[in-house]
Every structure is written in structure tokens, then in C-alpha cells.
């Protein structure tokens, strides 16, 4: 194990015993919602993984090391740290955060890197980043997509966030050779909504099939991971027809106010929260829990 990796006793034991493990990101804790709700949701997500027979390993940079698996005290400390004091880490700034001794929350890309270093093959998140609308002029494309082509981790998400350009995101993933596997349906889900209007490139209905695909990719010497897109539970979704005008309104307001670059996503998510009267956050929590359960089932299939 690299010396920069600090495994929790539970994570270390799970790796030694070849128990199923699921990596969890920390950006949702530090930048996703306020304290103490963020702590409660993090605990619920970990509990969902355990209910399906796997061990959760939340990942963050704390005290100059990559912590893989946070105990109750560390989780509380991270959740209660103001967001402005926490670096939001991707591939580009992971090493810098460690060098500076800062606290850092891992995005999808950084979590994949850290999970792979620790020997964890499955990771559950809410949604991945992707190609932003207007990327043909801004070139704003999330590092998550490139990471999926590099780090051999199976990522379970509810699709890319619906504020993004989903057709272009799918095209980039195809170009990068990333398998996009819809779980249990033919359409690509769109985060808050079960349907996006786009056909998924691949479909699988059994976690064992997804685990087998990961193993065969390794045997074939193929680099990168897999993206498993898991639709939000029907009772929690905000239907696509309802979300389209909400997203369009938030996007037009962002453009009118000249909001650009890294400020765009937080602005859009906050406006969507307001326009849906909080339903978008409720849906977000439901889909993360759903993804954690599926990831645990995939991890269990990989461990057999």
C-alpha cells in the first residue's frame, strides 16, 4: 500500500479478508449540503452499503494523507468543516492538496484514483461530471470522463447531472472507450429523472454480469473502468418533462447574470433546488442511496 494511503482498520481488515468494498466520494459531504444534513446523509449512504453486505470506504484527504475509510470522528470532522476551507479535488490538484497539508474532498475523478491505489474496484456516487452545455466554445469538459478511461474502477451513478449536455457527454465517453451500462433499462437515466430520451449503449440486469465484465476487461488488458448508470427509484424521480423547463430556466438565468466557469454548477444546482422547492435535493439523496446499494451488490459479485 502506498505510504500516502491511510486505511481505516475496517477497510484494512476488509481488504485482507477479501470482503466486498465500496468506495464513496466526499465532495457530496463538503459541498453538497449543509451540516448536519451532510453528516446524516453520509451515514445513511454507508449504512446502505452495509445492508447489502459490503464495507463502505469514504475517501478524503486529511492531515496530509489520503484517508480511505473514515471513522465516526473523521466523518464528523469533515462534515463540520466549512466548504471554503476544503479543496475540491480532481486529478490535477490531488498531489498539491497533499503537499500543502490541506483538507480535500474527492470528486469522481479523484475518488477513482484513490480507490484504485487502495485496491478498491467499485465506487458509488450520485452523478458524474460531463460535457457542459456550450462546450464547443468554452471547452468545459469534466475530468471525470478522462478518468473513467484511465482508472480501472466500476463507477455506479444515476447518469451525468442533467444540467450538462448529455448527448455530447455520451459521445465523449464513446470516443474514450468507456463502457456505459444502463442497469435494468434501455434508456440512459438523467440523474433526477429515470429517462433522458437517449438510448444507453449497453444494458445489464444483473450485478454479476457487471462484475464479470470488469473482470474480463482486466483479462483483455483494457485500461479504464466502467460507468454503470442506475436509474433513480420511480417514487423519488422528478420526471423529465417536469425537469426540462426547470433546467432551461436556471441555465438562462446563469447566462443573463454572466455566471461562468466553476461558478456555474453550484449556481444551477441551487436554482434548481429553489425552483423544485427542495425536491431536487430529496431526489439526489434517494439516488445516491440507490447507487450505494447497487454498488455493494456489484462488489459482492466481484468478491465471489
UniProtKB/Swiss-Prot annotation:
Its EC number is 4.2.1.70. GO terms for biological process: nucleobase catabolic process. Substrate binds at residues 88, 108, 142-144. The keyword Manganese applies. It catalyses: D-ribose 5-phosphate + uracil = psi-UMP + H2O. It is an enzyme of class 4 (lyase). Its cofactor is Mn(2+). One of its GO terms (cellular component) is cytoplasm. Mn(2+) binds at residue 140. Keywords: Glycosidase, Hydrolase, Lyase, Manganese, Metal-binding. One of its GO terms (molecular function) is pseudouridylate synthase activity. Binds 1 Mn(2+) ion per subunit. It holds the Pfam family Indigoidine_A. The active site is at residues 25, 161. Catalyzes the reversible cleavage of pseudouridine 5'-phosphate (PsiMP) to ribose 5-phosphate and uracil. Functions biologically in the cleavage direction, as part of a pseudouridine degradation pathway. HAMAP family: PsiMP_glycosidase (MF_01876). Homotrimer. Belongs to the pseudouridine-5'-phosphate glycosidase family. This is Pseudouridine-5'-phosphate glycosidase. The lineage of its organism: Bacteria, Pseudomonadati, Pseudomonadota, Alphaproteobacteria, Rhodobacterales.
